[in-house]
């Protein structure tokens, strides 16, 4: 292998409910690196993290990529070590730069970013702070509020609040008075709409809170709004750039997990049919959102737009967005004139700034 090639460690999988999506994203990223213009610059070294958090080197990683699914315990080298990162699968100095393609806890929450930081190695995407704040919806929204960014009204609470009858009654009353129905209950630290429920009355609100509390000790209740769901991709480090704006339209009451991942239940419009001024406002908001949480490298920012009132509300930021061939992040950049091979190369270049 020529020493002039930058050795990129693409790490994927992970001890997360979004393990399968991570594998699909990694396949797209690695395929983009195989483009002729990238083969002259980069050598990819894939690393796989199994569902128990064990790290594996290229031989196992390539098998997971080929099968396009999680490897079961019997498909892994035996005897299995204890769960978690117990040993490094390859010489750490054999990788020049890390490219995490991980979604959810233990991947985009600052943990693996901290590991790469301790290794003194550059990596694609946000650092520890931006990743951690971007993962936790309550911390994220506090940062957005401090930056003066418009958001849908919300309330934060904890799983412990549900165990105190008096405290719970006070919170339920506050939700009904300040947010009203319908409202949405969300775990603070999960992605892909996992654990999110819509509540139209107190019984549904209670059920949603208990369901979310089983997944995360930090909870969020958000006012429901009748609005279009729009997304914008951001790229860069010192100088952030925003993509064209895209829209998600769906055949459901709201954009839940089933709708998101069932073929034919939703479709995208890129670019979104919007007045030019609205698109510009959303692009500016996306960049401000990144600055608010100290996110850089790559991010996808989701907003709500009420075309009747003209209001735009910032929903959330995703600092390690999906990267499958159908995912919004690469699709938005392709529509903005940056094809996949160029996009992954720019992300690597950004990580070295």
Swiss-Prot record:
ATP-grasp domain sequence ranges: 141-349
Annotated residues for binding of ATP: 176-231
Listed pathway(s): Cell wall biogenesis; peptidoglycan biosynthesis
Keywords: ATP-binding, Cell shape, Cell wall biogenesis/degradation, Cytoplasm, Ligase, Magnesium, Manganese, Metal-binding, Nucleotide-binding, Peptidoglycan synthesis
GO MF: ATP binding; D-alanine-D-alanine ligase activity; metal ion binding
Location (main, coarse): cytoplasm
UniProt cofactor note: Binds 2 magnesium or manganese ions per subunit.
E.C. number: 6.3.2.4
Plastid keyword on record: no
SUPFAM superfamilies for this protein: Glutathione synthetase ATP-binding domain-like, PreATP-grasp domain
A GO cellular-component term linked to this record: cytosol
Subcellular location field: Cytoplasm
Protein name: D-alanine--D-alanine ligase
Organism for this UniProt entry: Synechococcus sp. (strain WH7803)
């Amino acid at each position: 292998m020529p020493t002039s090639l930058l050795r990129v460690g693409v790490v994927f999988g992970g001890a997360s409910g979004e393990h399968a999506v991570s594998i699909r994203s990694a396949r797209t990223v690695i395929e983009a690196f195989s483009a002729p213009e990238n083969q002259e610059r980069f050598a990819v070294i894939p690393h796989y993290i199994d569902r128990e958090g064990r790290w594996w080197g290229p031989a196992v990683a390539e098998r997971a990529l080929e099968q396009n699914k999680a490897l079961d315990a019997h498909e892994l080298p035996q005897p299995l070590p204890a769960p978690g990162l117990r040993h490094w699968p390859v010489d750490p100095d054999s990788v020049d730069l890390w490219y995490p393609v991980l979604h959810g806890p233990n991947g985009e929450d600052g943990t693996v970013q901290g590991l790469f930081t301790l290794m003194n190695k550059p990596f694609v995407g946000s650092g520890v702070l931006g990743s951690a704040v971007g993962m936790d919806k309550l911390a994220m929204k506090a940062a957005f509020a401090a930056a003066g960014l418009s958001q849908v009204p919300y309330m934060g609470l904890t799983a412990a609040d549900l165990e105190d009858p008096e405290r719970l009654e006070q919170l339920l009353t506050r939700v009904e008075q300040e947010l009203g129905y319908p409202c949405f209950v969300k775990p603070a630290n999960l992605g892909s709409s996992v654990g999110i429920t819509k509540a139209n009355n107190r019984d549904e609100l209670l059920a949603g809170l208990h369901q979310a509390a089983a997944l995360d000790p930090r909870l969020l209740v958000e006012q429901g709004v009748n609005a279009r769901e729009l997304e914008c991709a951001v790229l860069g480090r010192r100088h952030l750039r925003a993509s064209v704006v895209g829209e998600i339209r769906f055949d459901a009451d709201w954009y839940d997990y089933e709708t998101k991942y069932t073929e034919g239940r939703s479709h995208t419009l890129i670019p979104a049919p919007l007045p030019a001024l609205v698109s510009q406002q959303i692009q500016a908001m996306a960049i401000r959102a990144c600055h608010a949480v100290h996110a850089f490298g790559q991010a996808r920012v989701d907003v709500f737009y009420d075309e009747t009132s003209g209001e735009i509300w910032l929903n959330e930021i995703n600092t390690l967005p999906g990267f499958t061939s159908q995912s919004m992040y690469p699709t938005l950049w392709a529509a903005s004139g940056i094809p996949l091979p160029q996009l992954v190369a720019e992300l690597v270049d950004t990580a070295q700034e």
